[in-house]
Amino acid sequence: MSFLARRRHKKLAAMPGVRAVRRPVTPDSGERFDLHYVRTGPAGGAPLVIIPGGPGMASISAYQGIRKRAAAGGHGVIMVEHRGVGMSRCVDSGADLPPEALTIAAVVDDIAAVLDDAGVDTADIYGASYGTYLAAGLGVRHPNRVRTMVLDSPLLNRDDFEVVRSEARALLWHDDTDLAAKMRGLTGAGVLVPEDLTVAAVVYGIGGPDLL
């Protein structure tokens, strides 16, 4: 982890409601890492667990506005920084989590572990796009933790996820359109890096080409 990344990590960790729970790197490993999550709003009752699209986009920093609006409406919210992403990307040494640690089953079990750490028996689960895959997985592996569930733009299997990724790449990079040409131009000029395409796809999904 670089100096700048470490400094940003410490800043986010100091935000109200941010906590870390120790999780195994792999089921058979004795090594553990800090999985971060944030809980905001009223503490009583069943919170809303929001699982946004992705994968690869952090939750703690990017969705502060949504959590503030939810808190203003009297809703408690939990969002997990999933393993391999953002504040939950590294093992204690600062190295990235190994590929074998990044499985759907592990991510789903992480969500249940967060509910344990937060003292929550059941929660209302909201998943969007890729987040619906994780939400459904939680319902399968830990059905007793789910009070209600909303699946927004659901992915039903891994093939659906590949279709979405392929369409996003075509739309934002490969197509002969003004939007794709701008994305290629900004990347070539060093304004964007390839990883920014993940964020661009999320922005496009929310507000279309005008917002992007």
Question: Which stretches of residues belong to each language-model region?
Answer:
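Conserved acidic catalytic loop of the alpha/beta-hydrolase fold
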Residues: A105-A123
